[in-house]
Amino acid sequence: AGGQDLTSVATITQSQVSTADFTTRASGVVSGLHVVAAVLEYCGVNHYEVLVDEGAKVSAGKVLITAQGNTQKILLAERTALNFLSHLSGISTLTNQWVSEISGTKCQIRDTRKTTPGLRMLEKFAVRMGGGVNHRLSLSQAALIKDNHIMAAGSISDAFNAIKKMYPDKSIEIEVDSIDQLKEAITLKPDLILLDNMSTDQCSEAVSITNGLVKLEASGGIAITNAKAYAATGVDYLAIGSLTHSAPALDIGLDFRKGK
């Protein structure tokens, strides 16, 4: 934004220098440190030290980054840097909670395209730092045939064959919401089938029917409280939209050192 930081300009001399620490107020999994570094540099703070790795599990009170430089410039960077760091670390922390919940199964936690506009790549990075895996990064990376595509194309087979003809080398995933649709989808030999809003019993049946011929992803109606039950059905992935659209920010603050 244009203009000045009125508060800092009025209360702090241009020559004042300080040392400040980005410190966690709660335990979690950290991500977005490289974004903080970019924000600091953009604001003219070039002396800083990153003290932990991306994806590190930290406790409350951990210093993540120490910055030293012009006090006005540090304060200019503060909120933007913290917004990125808290948001992305919140995603990593929530993802790690889901990953821990289904430990001991072969299932993996995946994100979705339900990301904040403009922040998709950063949010998907945060998911990886939390131990999750990414779904497609863009509409052009792979095809996902959903209910609206099926409705528009006429059938699952029509939609699949049209994509296969135009993009023979692209991965194709088919969304199904019934066992009957699943049986039709299997005959097409897609790379992945998404089981939409199916119960754990239906997911178990789907695993039995496919018998390893195609990877399965469950989505919809899954909470962290029943994640282990879904993972235990034998599906390969749980697709969790809340990782990116509902993750609470990790509490992180910026503290100036006294006398410095």
Positions of predicted regions on the chain:
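Short secondary-structure boundary segments
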Residues: N197, G220, S242-L243
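Acidic/glycine-rich phosphate/pyrophosphate-binding loops and surrounding catalytic core
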Residues: A1-L188, L192, D201-I209, E217, ...
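Short acidic, glycine/proline-enriched helix-loop-strand junctions
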Residues: G212-K215, K258-G259
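Short, charged, intrinsically disordered terminal tails
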Residues: S242-K260
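Cys/His-rich Zn2+-binding cysteine-cluster or related metal-binding knuckle/ribbon modules and their
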Residues: I224
